[in-house]
A protein has these predicted regions:
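Catalytic-core environment of secreted peptidases
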Residues: 1, 68-70, 74-96, 114, ...
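Noncatalytic luminal/extracellular "stalk/propeptide" segments of secretory-pathway proteins
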Residues: 1-75, 79-87
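Short Pro/Gly-enriched beta-strand edge/turn motifs at strand-loop
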Residues: 2-8, 162-171
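Short alpha-helical segments and helix-capping/turn motifs at coil-helix boundaries
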Residues: 7-8, 19-20, 60-65, 98-105, ...
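Solvent-exposed loop/turn segments at secondary-structure junctions
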Residues: 12-15, 61-62, 82-85, 120-124, ...
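Extracellular/periplasmic catalytic domains that process cell-envelope and extracellular macromolecules
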Residues: 15-16, 46-50, 68-72, 108-110, ...
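Second-shell loop/turn segments in exported
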Residues: 23, 41, 45, 52-57, ...
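Loop-rich non-cytosolic ectodomains and luminal regions
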Residues: 70, 104-165, 212-219
Length: 220
């Protein structure tokens, strides 16, 4: 057998809350509902939501070049597309995930009031992809979310046309004290080298809005 065991471990307890709501409103009169999901670990917006202009970047260097004068009081929109030419798609994912993970931290350094990121998805569709993000001590915490690739294209096109685009956005997520969970451990002891170890790992948990079948049920 596999000698299954459970190992107690404390894990973060973050709750999404009510369904997120977002709209974009442009100076040219466009108003479109945006498909949005709070990033795991994000704070909420104010209870009444927030509204601020969007400024688009693709890289950390873009943030640095724009500086606080251009960014302060705005929502930073990280719009780096995944590269479809990589055969191993994790390479494309790995290049873009830095903005989801640390975008709120880096944007806040320049006075941004929020951060949104293009979903890490090679397709153009209406489905936002959540994922983990982080905050750092001594850096202001700002809300962070992912928008669908279709909505990312709409926002980017409007900005490219020179329009002022504002995001009206509300999310109510919150973080509670850590809660107990378990690592699941299985062991198949070899016959030839029973005291040597080959370690394989994966995750059985999934995001609250997913089913976990392919991330990472299939992987496990």
């Amino acid at each position: 057998g596999v000698n299954p065991q459970k190992q107690a471990v404390m894990v973060p307890h973050w709750v999404r809350g009510e369904k997120e709501v977002a709209f974009i409103k442009s100076s040219g009169g466009t108003k479109v509902e945006v498909n949005v999901l709070a990033l795991g670990g994000s704070i909420a917006t104010d209870a009444d939501g927030m509204m601020a202009p969007i400024i688009e970047v693709e890289t950390w260097e873009d943030l640095e070049e724009l500086g606080e004068e251009s960014i302060k009081g705005k929502i930073v929109f990280f719009n780096e597309e995944m590269n479809p030419e990589n055969i191993y798609t994790l390479h494309s994912y790995g290049h873009c995930v830095q903005h989801r993970w640390a975008g709120a931290v880096q944007a806040a350094k320049y006075g941004a009031v929020g951060a949104i990121v293009r979903s890490l998805n090679l397709r153009i569709d209406e489905f936002p992809h959540t994922g983990s993000m982080t905050y750092e001590d001594a850096i202001d915490t700002i809300p962070a979310a992912a928008i669908s690739t279709r909505d990312a294209e709409i926002v980017s096109d409007l900005l490219a046309e020179g329009e002022i685009v504002e995001l009206i956005w509300k999310q109510s997520c919150q973080t509670f004290p850590d809660v107990p969970s378990h690592n699941v451990i299985g062991e198949i002891r070899g016959s030839k080298y029973p005291d040597e170890i080959i370690l394989l790992g994966g995750h059985l948990d999934s995001w609250d809005v997913g089913h976990g079948a392919h991330d990472d049920g299939a992987g496990v």
